[in-house]
């Protein structure tokens, strides 16, 4: 458990990117939603 917590924490040099790293896993979901909206716009052809 401690090893996973240690790996999950970014090194101090990269602390400024911490909020960005929290958001990055969500980006593929936006692409999935975009594909759905695009298909809805063209009528699911």
Swiss-Prot record:
Give the UniProt subcellular location, in the record's own words: Cellular thylakoid membrane
- TM segment ranges: 24-44
Highest taxon of source = Bacteria
Q: Does the keyword Acetylation apply?
A: no
Share an example GO biological-process annotation for this protein: photosynthesis
Query: What is the membrane topology noted in the UniProt record heading this document?
Result: Single-pass membrane protein
Oligomeric state and interaction partners are given as:
PSII is composed of 1 copy each of membrane proteins PsbA, PsbB, PsbC, PsbD, PsbE, PsbF, PsbH, PsbI, PsbJ, PsbK, PsbL, PsbM, PsbT, PsbX, PsbY, PsbZ, Psb30/Ycf12, peripheral proteins PsbO, CyanoQ (PsbQ), PsbU, PsbV and a large number of cofactors. It forms dimeric complexes.
* Assigned protein family: Belongs to the PsbK family.
Q: Which PANTHER family match?
A: PHOTOSYSTEM II REACTION CENTER PROTEIN K, PTHR35325
Name of the featured protein: Photosystem II reaction center protein K
Lineage start? Bacteria, Bacillati, Cyanobacteriota, Cyanophyceae, Oscillatoriophycideae
């Amino acid at each position: 458990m401690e090893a996973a917590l240690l790996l999950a924490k970014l090194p101090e040099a990269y602390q400024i990117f911490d909020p960005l790293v929290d958001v990055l896993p969500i980006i593929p979901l936006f692409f999935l939603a975009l594909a759905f909206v695009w298909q809805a716009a063209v009528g699911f052809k």
